[in-house]
Amino acid sequence: MMRSYEELLERAFEKLADKDVVRRERFEIPRVSIQREGARTILKNFSQIAKTLNRSEDHLYKYIVKSLGTAGFIDNGRLVLQGKFTESELQKEVDDYVRLYVLCRECNSPDTEFIKEERVLMLRCLACGAKHPVRNI
């Protein structure tokens, strides 16, 4: 028995409505979590962020410190920065880092790695194979 397109579509939506579907991105960066101690700002989940991005803590540390124009150090998975910074300022730096050093410029995939070709640091996408030069920190 032939059914109309509308009937089939309605039936499909009824079946979908029974399922509790939650759409999540495969790549979710943890929001920055800070703590202030006097004139210092501590990024408490620094190690977790670096691990999620699949980048070394040292590389992310150098980018944040240079971008903010401050001094800092890594202490037990936390980033301690000289100066008072807001969560939004630090989140902006992490988002900029992801845009420049993590996401593929061709397919937007986070599955990338650093390689060196003739003394030039390159970002190679493991999904599409594209390679792009990135600026040294």
Swiss-Prot record:
Protein family (similarity comment): Belongs to the eIF-2-beta/eIF-5 family.
Biological function: eIF-2 functions in the early steps of protein synthesis by forming a ternary complex with GTP and initiator tRNA.
GO MF assignments: translation initiation factor activity
UniProt xrefs under SMART domains: eIF2B_5 (SM00653)
Subunit text: Heterotrimer composed of an alpha, a beta and a gamma chain.
Source organism, top-level taxon: Archaea
Classification via Pfam families: eIF-5_eIF-2B
Protein name: Translation initiation factor 2 subunit beta
